UniProtKB/Swiss-Prot annotation:
Disulfide bonds: none annotated. Pathway: tRNA modification; wybutosine-tRNA(Phe) biosynthesis. Residues 10-22 have a biased composition (Polar residues). It catalyses: 7-[(3S)-3-amino-3-carboxypropyl]wyosine(37) in tRNA(Phe) + S-adenosyl-L-methionine = 7-[(3S)-(3-amino-3-methoxycarbonyl)propyl]wyosine(37) in tRNA(Phe) + S-adenosyl-L-homocysteine; 7-[(3S)-(3-amino-3-methoxycarbonyl)propyl]wyosine(37) in tRNA(Phe) + S-adenosyl-L-methionine + CO2 = wybutosine(37) in tRNA(Phe) + S-adenosyl-L-homocysteine + 2 H(+). This is tRNA wybutosine-synthesizing protein 4.
Length: 686
């Protein structure tokens, strides 16, 4: 690497460090963690989003867990030498200061290594900040030619390149690091920025150099799915490509990577498992109520694409595992796939007429017309709550075409709600219930949408009239992520509204019935054991009742249960459907009944490293089977959450409409076109 390339590399790393450090500062400012030193080390004030806060919180807790485990282990033994923490690629991290202030460094010292420019800048900030100097005690600042940028009795900062191992070893020796002492080597999002051969050399070098060591890394994984592809694209755009993910795509591959490099033991968890297993429930509840939050899909996907790993060598650090095993396995993998369902793009519409949004709702008005409204998407070159309606239509056997349609007149306007429901009342009329404008602002009232055709019957010429639905007063439905299902009782048509969440309730278990003919809320007796509250579940009409499947429960954990609200003479009866083999808990999916089978399509799950496809459940036997979606013919990442879908039973096809999400800090992604799933393999005999 030449001087210019090295300089560009250092600048990119500095930019990455600055962004991460600002996120950590924002994390502390909002009360997720206690860190009085982050603001002193990181200039500037930025308030990150709740999603970023949660992502950095679980990262901080995972690293904290490993550091505390190391300090507990080394503190319990009598050693003639002090324990050591060696932080690689430490940037502006405040670890030393937090440990020192907590009194946890009485028998431990800290060494940090980063690029020279990064390390010198940190040393200068410490020198200029009295509160930081008070923690370090007397110190020395190295000259510009020295790799040792800062030195105190228990803290040293070095400027060195992790790819130059011989020089790194010499610098650590000169800085007083004792290779024989128990040592924690910490690398937060570091190895992945090294080329695979360089990272392998570093892992082996550390194993050979430190006979009593714990190596902890926090990094990305799972590059192959849609979220992983967006993640890779993001870092490529930053000129900081992620290396080695294809070689080590999951936690088991990462474990074998370290074991084969000379480490005695190694364990690793993705951050969903770490969060649910190793953070106490009361602490999780505290964090989950710090800020209004409604990006569960992206939160869980982020956690499934990062892992924390601890590899150890030597008798001292290998006897006690850092991640104690749990009594019950966290993994709930789906059954082996019974087959594949081919996916293909069914629209060729231009960008201005495509449906690029998520959190919307779609309704099949007639076999050739699908109407969509709401959601967050792209409109007039910016990302926003979408105000325009979308019509997907075709005539005879022609291809599907999409178009944007507008509101007619000035009496009513679409309010831009998300996570609402829409129900077809006729070929030209739709009822909208619930939804939200923001996590603290529910949508106001029910809406009636009337679609008016143009004189030439051209889809582009159609208009929508928005009016307040004439529901009885005092019946405000202030929830979102709920379901609305058509059911029948005493030969009368009702809409069954179930579940969801609100500003005050993280989950709802309410059952409400709207009489369609009179638009009045009515009370109908419901017997049986009620399902636990949930949101982001699916609901389908079947045999006059409703099938409720999956969803996210009160503890923000996906559910696997399937219930049938069965019509009976006295009202309705909740029945639990026994499924074999049991299915992986999921939410944010869609569902349809097809040929006597319940199809659960896409969604998000946290208990398996695979990607949800289509789960098929026989409604007569309860037998389930799994089908993967073959996306080889889809030329872009297909994200199947926050989407909508429409079943075309006569054609044995399912249309997947919209979908995507705000992919952590990697950018917002929208599925650009409508995709069709071929269901012909799920015939009556399957």
């Amino acid at each position: 690497m030449g001087p210019r390339s090295r300089q560009r590399r250092t600048g990119t790393v500095q930019s990455t460090n600055d962004s991460s450090s600002l996120s950590k500062r924002s994390l502390a400012a909002q009360g997720y963690v206690s860190d009085a030193f982050a603001p002193l080390l990181v200039p500037g004030i930025v308030r990150r989003t709740p999603l970023i806060h949660r992502g950095y919180y679980v990262r901080a807790r995972a690293v904290r867990h490993c550091v505390r485990a190391f300090l507990d282990l080394t503190g319990a033994i009598r050693s003639p030498t002090r324990a050591q923490i060696l932080s690689l690629g430490s940037g502006s991290d405040s670890l030393y200061f937090r440990l020192k202030a907590a009194g946890l460094l009485t028998r431990t010292a800290v060494w940090e290594v980063d690029f020279p420019d990064v390390s010198r800048l940190k040393a200068k900030r410490i020198e200029e900040t009295p509160e930081l100097c008070a923690q370090t005690g007397p110190f020395k600042i190295g000259d510009s030619a020295s790799t040792l940028c800062f030195e105190s009795s228990d803290y040293r900062i070095l400027g060195a390149d992790l790819r130059e191992l011989q020089r790194l070893g010499e610098a650590l020796d000169s800085a007083g690091l004792d290779a024989t002492s128990p040592t924690l080597i910490l690398a937060e999002a570091v190895l992945t920025y090294l080329e695979p051969s360089r990272a392998a050399a570093l892992i082996a070098w550390v194993a050979q150099r430190f006979p009593n060591a714990l190596f902890v890394i926090y990094e990305q994984m799972k590059p192959g799915d849609a979220f992983g592809q967006i993640m890779l694209q993001h870092f490529r755009r930053l000129n900081s490509p992620l290396h080695g993910l294809e070689l080590f795509p999951d936690v088991e591959a990462q474990r074998q990577r370290f074991l084969q490099a000379g480490w005695t033991t190694c364990s690793a968890l993705d951050l969903n498992e770490f969060y649910r297993r190793l953070i106490p429930a009361d602490e999780r509840r505290r964090v989950e109520t710090l800020e209004p939050f409604d990006e569960f899909e992206e939160w869980h996907l982020k956690c499934s694409h990062y892992f924390i790993l601890a590899a150890s060598r030597g008798d001292i650090l290998s006897e006690t595992p850092v991640f104690l095993p749990s009594e019950a396995s966290f993994q709930i993998d789906p059954a082996l796939p019974s087959g594949f369902l081919s996916a293909s793009v069914v629209t060729s519409d231009h960008q201005h007429s495509s449906l690029q949004r998520y959190g919307h709702t779609s309704v099949l008005l007639s076999p050739g017309i699908i109407f969509s409204a709401g959601g967050f998407g792209e409109q007039e070159g910016r990302h926003c709550r979408v105000s325009r309606f979308h019509l997907l239509s075709r005539s005879c056997d022609s291809e599907w075409k999409g178009c944007q349609i507008s509101t007619l007149g000035t009496e009513g306007q679409w309010d831009g709600r998300l996570y609402h429901t829409m129900t077809r009342l006729s070929d030209t009329r739709v009822l909208v219930l619930g939804g939200r404008l923001s996590p603290v602002n529910p949508a106001s009232g029910a809406l009636q949408l009337d679609i008016y055709k143009s004189e030439d019957n051209c889809p582009e010429g159609q208009n929508v009239v928005v009016t307040k639905a004439a529901l009885e007063e005092g019946s405000m439905l202030s929830c979102w992520r709920h379901s609305t299902t058509e059911v029948y009782y005493q030969n009368q048509r009702y809409l069954f509204v179930y579940g969801g969440r609100s500003v005050t309730d993280p989950v709802l278990s309410d059952c409400r019935f709207l009489h369609v003919e009179t638009m009045a809320w009515v009370r109908i007796p419901v017997q049986g054991s009620s399902p636990e509250g949930r949101h982001s579940h699916s609901a389908c009409s079947w045999q006059g009742g409703a099938l409720i499947a999956g969803g996210l429960g009160a503890s923000e954990e996906p559910l696997s249960s399937v219930f049938f609200l069965r019509p009976v003479s006295s009202g309705f009866l909740w029945e639990s459907i026994h499924i074999q083999p049991s299915i992986t808990p999921r939410y944010s999916h869609t569902a349809h009944v097809f040929n006597g089978k319940l199809l659960l399509v896409g969604g998000v799950w946290i208990h398996s490293s695979s990607v949800p496809g289509v789960t098929v459940i026989s409604l007569t036997t309860g037998l389930s089977s799994e089908y993967q979606i073959d996306t080889a013919s889809v030329p872009w990442p297909l994200m199947l959450h926050n989407h909508s879908s429409a079943l075309l039973p006569e054609e044995q096809q399912l249309l997947l409409i919209g979908g995507g999400g705000n992919c952590f800090s990697f950018g917002t992604y929208f599925n650009p076109h409508t995709v069709g799933l071929d269901l012909s393999s799920l015939g009556l005999g399957q």
